[in-house]
């Protein structure tokens, strides 16, 4: 699968998604949009995905991506939703499969994360065959 085409298809289907990244089942960043540099944040993202998939996983109160802090408002095996309290956007992290694979998206600050949730989760499910 061409991850760049995949991400741009998501962004075309869901205009509220401003940036996105794909992390594979080994926890490696395999694609990110050009203006979103999250390689320094991948370990934290992998930890959250690992915890959310455990029966007794520990919810973190927040996460930082590109030095911006987001408060985690939903923590389920299907999704992790976080929002920046200074209105600088939202993060939807959609785990894929049973490993560390995930689709990570940055959502338009003027929209709510739920506006993009259906399309983000729908696209994340398309990654399951790969990861």
Residue ranges of each PLM-predicted region?
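Non-catalytic interaction/Regulatory regions outside core domains
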Residues: 1-131
């Amino acid at each position: 699968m061409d991850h760049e085409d995949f991400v741009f298809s998501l962004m075309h289907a869901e205009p509220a998604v401003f940036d996105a990244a794909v992390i594979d089942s080994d926890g490696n960043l395999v694609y990110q949009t050009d203006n979103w540099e999250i390689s320094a944040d991948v370990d934290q993202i992998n930890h959250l995905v690992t915890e959310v998939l455990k029966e007794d996983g520990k919810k973190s109160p927040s996460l930082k991506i590109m030095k911006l802090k987001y408060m985690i408002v939903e923590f389920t095996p299907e999704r992790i939703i976080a929002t920046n309290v200074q209105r600088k956007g939202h993060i939807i992290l959609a785990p894929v499969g049973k490993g560390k694979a995930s689709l990570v998206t940055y959502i338009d600050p003027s929209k709510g994360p739920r506006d993009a949730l259906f399309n983000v989760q729908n696209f994340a499910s398309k990654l399951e065959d790969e990861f």
